Amino acid sequence: MKFKFLNMDNESGFILIEKELKRLKITAQVKEDGIELKGENIKQARIYLQTLFNSNIMELDDHQKSANALIERLKSLDLKIAVAESCSGGLLSHAFTSISGASAVFMGGVVCYSEEVKRELLKVNATTLKVFGVYSEECVKEMLLGVFLNFKVGLALAISGVAGPNGGSKANPVGTIYIGVQRLGSQALIDRCFFEGNRESIQNKSVEHALNMLARML
């Protein structure tokens, strides 16, 4: 089981649960991006954590659990979100819409697979695409702004990159993914990631990282 705290940093949260984890004979590896638990009593540990922290923890083992925790967190903060995604092809939207009740916070998404859709619907500047390309921090920043233009939301997520197996370049080889999150009125947070694996694996890892970035912003 891997999870992270949404209302505090992982190191501080671990101090609160360390004694109980030892009692359950659970070993823990604490990192900035999450806490990984191992042991025979993971089921009991999960129940303990959910009882104690409710929606203030997010499991990172699968998209559905991550999205469910984020939806509850967004509800508590009275925030709505929409997305723009290219190489993930709708998987980011699906991570939210697979959860019953997501419509309370998830307003919709744009699968902007072509440059034309990025330009026409999201208003990504043609010069940005020509100078920096679709696989760039600059493109993702403008995709985020395009989300705010199309949806009445307080949060935006965007993904663009090379999922492979074809495509890519020396500057942006297959597996290079740019992921951005932005709160309305605040500066965008953009990560340049490199994921290994086949196309499906890279797409899934992109969605997982996007959900992680959203959790970090919240």
Regions found by a protein language model. Give the residues of each.
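Short alpha-helical segments enriched in small residues
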Residues: M1-L24, K38, I42-L218
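Short, surface-exposed charged micro-motifs
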Residues: T27
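Short Gly/Ser/Thr- and Asp/Glu-enriched loop/turn motifs at secondary-structure junctions
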Residues: V30-G34
